[in-house]
Each structure stands twice: as C-alpha cells, then as structure tokens.
Amino acid sequence: MLVKPSDGYGSQNVSVVFSESDLGNLMESLGVHASNRFSVEKYIRGHMIGCDVFSSEHERILIGINDKLMFPPPSFAMRGSCFPSDRYDIPAIRDYAFEILDAVNFDFGASHIEMIVAEDGPYLVEVNPRLVSAQIPHQMGYALERSVYADLINLHLGLPITKLRDLKPRWFSAIRWVVASQPGILESIQLPEHVDESIRRVVLFKETGDAVRPPIHNGDRIGYVIAVGDTQTAAEEIADRYVQETLVILK
C-alpha cells in the first residue's frame, strides 16, 4: 500500500509498504513529523498520467494527456513529463476522466485528474478542481502554441469552449529536472553552451550555497528544462540530453 501524511505536499514523506516490518519502520520514522493523519491507498504498478479537462454547461473537452516520469525508488519526485502523449488509449482515458467528473458532479471549470495506467486499465489517483499547476501550463503552452491560462479565463467569461475540441498540439513538449547526484552544498551550475530552438525554457530554483541532495521529493530538484520535438520520443531525448550536459558542481 501507499502511505502519505495528509499534511504533506510535493511528494514529501510518501512511502510504499510491502510488509508489516515496512509499516513498523514507517510509523517510527514519521511519528515525530506527521499530524497522525495519513492517506492510505492501494499501490498500483503502472504509469502515472495527468489529464486536464475543461467543462462547461454544454460539454467537456480533454485538453490532453501528460505522461509523467518519476525518479527510481525510493524517490517519489517527478523526473519530468511530456505533453501531449500518444502512448495511451486516448478515447478510453477520456471516457474514464469524464465518468469521474460526472461521479463527483463537477460541471464547470478546469480540472486536473491524475491516474495510474496499469495493465488492466486506468485507476484514479486524485481529482483537482483546478488547472494543473507548477510548470505544466508552460509546458502545455509550448506544445499548443497558445495560453491555457487565456483559455481558462475565456471559459470563466462565458465564452464557448467548442473551438478547443479540435485543438491539435503543434509539438510534443517534454520537461526534465536537474538534480544533484549526491548530497552537498551547491557551488555552481554549468548549463550547455550550444542549444537550438528546441530548448524553450530553462529555470533554476537553487542558488549557490544551497544544500542539495539526490531527489527524495519534488523540493529537492534544482531546476528544469522544457524542450519540444516532432514526436514524444524526440522531445524527451532533447530534454534528457540537455540535463545530461548540465554540470552540477558541489563544494
């Protein structure tokens, strides 16, 4: 099962429990930090995706699927993602997302639905009654060559969303995160000198003198790059290569 404190965020203190001994160790380690309230979920092996849906009084529209990638266990930090994704059964995912929104009577505005796609189909992780946050709207904007923020504002101004039904992404847009390979104090970051127009955005959150470590949760990440490509694989490879060529120098 998957256990996480109800007062956490950013994938902090998330653990997978496979046995009673795992549970005992977890309770001992979290006891002094948590609020004694936990979310306990079935652990499902599969691929995590995010679906952003716009709903109006007349229809729902799936803007696209964001294919998420995590760092290896025991980390629960996100290594990156790609929007859109063509690696899933889009009609089946769309139908499932719409059924979820119908079940919770969500009928207006943006919603962000996270799922695990397992071998036997998709499983709901959570429903957020808002547009996806963090860097993803920028990522979507580069793929769609339009502002999803503007589209959301127009929805709340009462403008029809019918035109979004035929929205076709111009690019696949991939995010990859820069992280430290070992604990230490950040001295500098050397970014690749020669990049082409496929690199659309680079942002660094950590500064010289900050403590860094290999990623356990999302707050451990140093910065990110967004790259675009004609295919999902191409965009991911460009972003991966940029991260590989970035040097994180520790004191």
Where are these predicted regions, by residue range?
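Peripheral (often C-terminal) accessory segments that flank ATP-dependent C-N-forming ligase machineries
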Residues: 153-251
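Short, well-ordered beta-strand elements within core beta-sheets of diverse protein domains
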Residues: 15, 42, 85, 141, ...
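Short, flexible turn/loop "capping" segments at secondary-structure junctions
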Residues: 5-7, 74-75, 215-220
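A short linear hydrophobic-aromatic micro-motif
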Residues: 1-3, 36-40, 162-164, 201-203
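Internal nucleotide-binding/catalytic subdomain
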Residues: 7, 14-120
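Active-site "cap" helix and flanking loop/linker of ATP-utilizing ligase/carboxylase catalytic domains
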Residues: 92-113, 119, 128-184
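A short, flexible beta-alpha/helix-coil linker loop
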Residues: 7-10, 133
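Protein kinase-like catalytic core scaffold
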Residues: 1, 61, 123-126
